């Protein structure tokens, strides 16, 4: 069993910087502004020869339980309960504050082993803060600089001493797991795409939950998980980082990604929000299925349509969730109207799946997941070249390509070159002159004949002959 370590402390002491240093990549958003981290994030980490899971937490603040900061503190307390060991981080440059003293008392009451971490110790001004740290009653401070990577050997030794050294030396399997998690997201995506197209139920299905702010994305995920894992509330823009959580639905392992709400580009001014948006876009690209959460009381706003278009252009499986369905009075008539709008406003993908649900009460979640599983299989579908070319012969005979500059265009051959999403290459004469209307015809006929509704389909053209024609000539 692996060791779990929680990083706690007041805001802006460098917890997320230390988290990023331990996991080997910039997963948590970092900014000079206090209170950047709101949800707790768990990830596999490495420190020299030690292997463990680390939890990044929101900064502890003294405030009422029902405020945003109070709800964040409750999530940090949950992380302390989950952890086997606590890294209590303070800002050695600023010295010990009354908040540090109060929160040190809270951490001591947990009864967990604690390592006191004096961060930002690269400055001479930090010496005074390190002396003051003895007043916390947490033992000798371990001096580090998370930003510059200084003092990590001392931190490794302190963790070993506090934990007793058990459960934190990596086996070969753990090392492979860490190497995979520490790779860049782009490299991981490329690696997945190179491994082939066989549908494998044993691999976790990656689902991102996206949408504009305050549509109920985090509430929906909490209801799926059956626990208040993610911070929720009436405030718009609560989620900042893209947080991944593990879930199981009917025996299938799922990795869910909660994402920050996407606003119109013209409204995004702060650096922190720009970082959140970039994190959300990466989560969408990393996902296989993207559940786009619409507020059923105000659906199909311009931003909703732009997010759906983004998901389609990225080649992910788009699936719309009409959330807050419990607030809709005439549900049957509303659903008919919404489905008609889906067809009219999102023509890029015919047969787009849309499911009404209530994240607050859990209604419609099974229906949503049934559609997710079905569309994910379609997204992975591969069609034999023989079937494709028999289909091509039929549809070209029924509706041949148009004539351009006095000569009829010819489509001679088709093959599927990839899945996830399905991609097809058509061999034809003069591909640059093929009109978009005929490409749409090919795409729609592919959907109808091979039952591929609701997913992006990629079509490309090339000017080359049927490879079988060359063989027949040689004979």
UniProtKB/Swiss-Prot annotation:
It holds the Pfam family MMR_HSR1. PROSITE patterns: G_ENGA. GO terms for biological process: ribosome biogenesis. One of its GO terms (molecular function) is GTP binding. Residues 381-465 form the KH-like domain. It comes from the Bacteria. InterPro entries: G_ENGA, GTP-bd, GTPase_Der, KH_dom-like, KH_dom-like_a/b, P-loop_NTPase, Small_GTP-bd. Signal peptide: none annotated. Keywords: GTP-binding, Nucleotide-binding, Repeat, Ribosome biogenesis. GTP 1 binds at residues 9-16, 56-60, 119-122. Residues 3-167, 205-380 form the EngA-type G domain. GTP 2 binds at residues 211-218, 258-262, 323-326. GTPase that plays an essential role in the late steps of ribosome biogenesis. Associates with the 50S ribosomal subunit. HAMAP family: GTPase_Der. Belongs to the TRAFAC class TrmE-Era-EngA-EngB-Septin-like GTPase superfamily. EngA (Der) GTPase family. PANTHER family: GTPASE DER. This is GTPase Der. The gene is der.
